[in-house]
A protein has these predicted regions:
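Zn2+-dependent peptidoglycan hydrolase active-site motif and core
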Residues: 129-131, 135-180, 208, 212-214
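Hydrophobic alpha-helical membrane-insertion segments, chiefly the h-region
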Residues: 22-32
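Surface-exposed, glycine-biased beta-strand/turn segments
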Residues: 38-156, 238-379
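N-terminal Sec-pathway targeting helices
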Residues: 6-21
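Conserved beta-strand positions that form and line the central face of beta-propeller blades
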Residues: 118, 172, 197
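Short beta-turn/strand-loop junction motif enriched in small, turn-promoting residues
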Residues: 124, 145-148, 178, 199-203
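Surface-exposed strand-loop junctions at beta-sheet edges and helix termini
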Residues: 137, 183-184, 189
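Conserved, short, structured surface segments that act as functional micro-motifs
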Residues: 152-161, 187-262
């Protein structure tokens, strides 16, 4: 006959047989339902497929019927109060594109780069929430949708792909409160199609009173970015539509250009964008970027090095093979800054470049940019 203590232990062990599996299931099930501290699921395959579809050579620019992304009609007048939403600083310039903001780094204040326009709300409800609809600016295809506000600094955001003679141009609509029904990758949209409602979603807090639309337009740096990103074991994974891979040009400059030349292509606009720096890069092959935007490449195939003219935030504006003399200047280096146009570089908020011993070189952010541009054929 078992002692009382032994009987109690026996009953406890029998209970463990069904308690342990239930506990394990509970942890797994509710962890997946609630996110469990993991990143919410995002679509990473569909955007890549949509962005890599071929653009027909006879494609016409999609901008002739361009509309503004909200009901705000004063977008070309940044000096008018209420058109753009500044940061907490109250500085109107902080809503614009460029090195217009100041942040803290290592205990000191440094310029930071803002890659789009922050368009203010025209209408709000009784609680102060924006009521403005956010709309597609031109004919396009939904390339990516992030439905989880905490999964990106962009919050809830939509990326559209637009077919232009230059190739695939993107527009991005960020900090949305909600998405319109049916907005998902692969959906074709027309100018003015409602994408969602303006909001203040983000992985970093934005007060409701400063809810706005963050709008970008630009090019995709590398079609294989998602593979590079996952190899680094980084999160969150938005595939090719991660913000690092979407390099925006000045939307206000583009909108002004398009108003003057509504039939022009994005390539025509890019011809007006000045270079901030020209860089000599060691390569194994021509970068994916110039395969997807061949009109930005001139001349023969590279023979081990290329020269790229870049905007302040690293948009490759033009590329060509390096000359023999330029290859000689590179030596065993992986990169060399040929020239810097300091009037264009300005406050250098992207910090792709830095001075060392009076010489311009790639900074840490610049080395990452080089790696993303050249992947998967890094020298």
């Amino acid at each position: 006959m078992q002692a009382p203590a032994a009987r109690r232990m026996s009953r406890w062990l029998r209970h463990l047989v069904w308690i342990v599996p239930l506990v394990i299931f509970d942890i797994w099930f509710f962890g997946h339902r609630r996110g469990g501290g993991c990143e919410p699921p995002v679509s990473v395959e569909e955007p890549a497929a949509i962005l890599e579809q071929e653009v027909a050579p006879e494609t016409h620019p999609p901008w002739a019927r361009l509309v503004y992304p909200t009901d705000q009609q004063g977008i070309l007048q940044p000096g008018v109060p209420g058109v753009y939403q500044p940061t907490a600083s109250g500085n109107p310039d902080s809503a614009m594109y460029g090195s217009v903001r100041t942040g803290s780094r290592g205990g000191r204040l440094v310029p930071t780069f803002h890659e789009g326009l922050d368009i203010a709300a025209l209408r709000r409800d009784a609680q102060g929430r924006p009521l403005d609809e956010v709309r597609a600016v031109a004919d396009g295809v939904v390339a990516h949708v992030n439905r989880f506000g905490g999964n990106s600094n962009y919050g809830v955001y939509v990326v559209l792909r637009h077919d232009d003679p230059i190739g695939r141009v993107f527009t991005l609509y960020a900090h949305l409160l909600s998405l319109a029904p049916g907005i998902q990758p692969g959906v074709v949209v027309k100018p003015g199609a409602v994408l969602g409602r303006m909001g203040n979603t983000s992985s970093s807090p934005i007060p409701m009173a400063r809810g706005h639309l963050h709008f970008e337009i630009g090019l995709i740096l590398n079609g294989q970015f998602g593979t590079w990103f996952r190899a680094k074991k980084l999160k969150p994974d938005h595939g090719a539509c991660h913000g690092w891979n979407l390099l925006g040009l000045n939307p206000l400059d583009f909108l002004r250009f398009q108003k003057e030349k509504p039939e022009a292509s994005f390539l025509d606009f890019m011809a007006t964008v000045p270079s901030a720096f020209d860089i000599l890069l060691a390569v194994r092959r021509k970068p994916d970027f110039f395969d997807r935007y061949p009109a930005l490449w001139s001349g023969e195939q590279p023979g081990g090095a290329i020269v790229v003219a870049c905007s302040e935030n690293g948009v490759p504006l033009r590329g060509r093979a390096a000359t023999a003399a330029e290859r000689g200047q590179l030596g065993k280096l992986k990169s060399r800054i040929i020239r810097v146009h300091e009037d264009v570089l300005g406050r250098n908020g992207s910090r792709l470049l830095t001075r060392r011993a009076g010489v311009w070189v790639l900074a840490v952010a610049g080395e990452q940019w080089r790696e993303m541009l050249l992947y998967p054929s890094l020298p």
